[in-house]
Amino acid sequence: RVDYSSGNWSEGLTTYLADYWQVELASEDEAKEMRYGWLRNYASITDGDEKSLQAFTTRHHTASSTIGYGKSAMFFHMLRKSIGNEPFINCLKDFWLTYRYQSASFHDIRDTCQTHTNINLTVFFDSWIPTVGAPKLSANLTQTNAPERLMTINHDGKWVYPLDVEISSDANAIESTKLMRGDEITFALSVDDVKSTKIKLDPNFNIWRKLDAAELVGTLRDFIAAKQATYIQLTSDIQDGSAIISTYFMENTTYGEQTPDSNKSKKDPVIILGDIASITEHLNKSVNAIDSEHLMPISEVDFVMVSTYITNTPTLLISTPKVITDKDFSMLISRARHYGKYSWLKISPNGITEKGKWPIQEKVFSF
């Protein structure tokens, strides 16, 4: 049973063991995509909606689910990477045998795992359980006495975790794991007569962190939890698309506007409803214009929803059939809510559903 005084650990542990680990055993690529999905969900919630693991008790909305399930599952993933597979499994076995008829907390998990490792887990748990926020990774390379350079990695906080680092140059490639602790770490890097150096931090999404802008892939869930979204209706038979979208798809109300507001913050999302011609025109201006071939062709009778970025603005494009009633639109919008993890969705008149995700991009620090 869960001792809720220090947070609900069971949802995250169940997600990690019952859902994630089975995926990892079958395919590391799919496991990586699942870890990325947790981080992508985190990127879609606002700072004001974020709570600590200690404050999470049960799921109420998208933000609480992101923390209580996603962040908690990633916490156990980082714990496993910190102490190793065998100690992690033995820890869970001991924890089950000790507390199966009792209430237990994150602290009890910590104390049980501490008997299986020499790593100070108090510091690790304290950096993740009562805190909000996440590491924002950056790297810097400075020249010292040749052939050495100094590599500095900053994460904008004091979290503790093992960080995978990939360093490649003209001559060679190095993969290592560094223990992040404190504000930053600095270490010497020997690079022999190279013209350029490329660095990847956590390239496989093994830690709970803020994704770099280059790594962000648009998802429909971005708009389910969005706040202060601007609504723009171009052409459609729908009388009041803003009200329907707010009621059946989003957790918050949109701001209805007929034309874009140039003074509005580019961080605030935009929802555009129109016919196939107008939506295709906007899609061709987006960062996913090349990738959009996966959802083509779009006919005038299809319902299409696409999450993308246009001039750095999160944008949801919705194309409705040429003839549609408010009732049918409400049903389609409500159905789309179940596809939050995807980047785009297409529903044909006969009900056939196609869906997909934009390819994940890597963040590379080049020097």
Could you tell me what each predicted segment is?
Residues 1-152, 199:
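Hydrophobic alpha-helical and helix-loop surface patches within well-folded domains
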Residues 14, 61, 98-103, 208, ...:
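Flexible loop/turn segments at secondary-structure boundaries
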Residues 81, 100, 114, 130-133, ...:
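Hydrophobic alpha-helix feature that most strongly marks membrane-spanning transmembrane helices
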Residues 177-178, 205-222:
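Edge beta-strands of extracellular beta-sandwich domains
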Residues 121-122, 136-202:
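Beta-strand-rich binding/interaction modules
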Residues 21, 156-158, 170-172, 204-206, ...:
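Short, glycine-/Ser/Thr-/acidic-enriched flexible segments
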Residues 63-64, 124-127, 137-140, 151-155, ...:
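Generic recognition of flexible, low-complexity loop/linker segments
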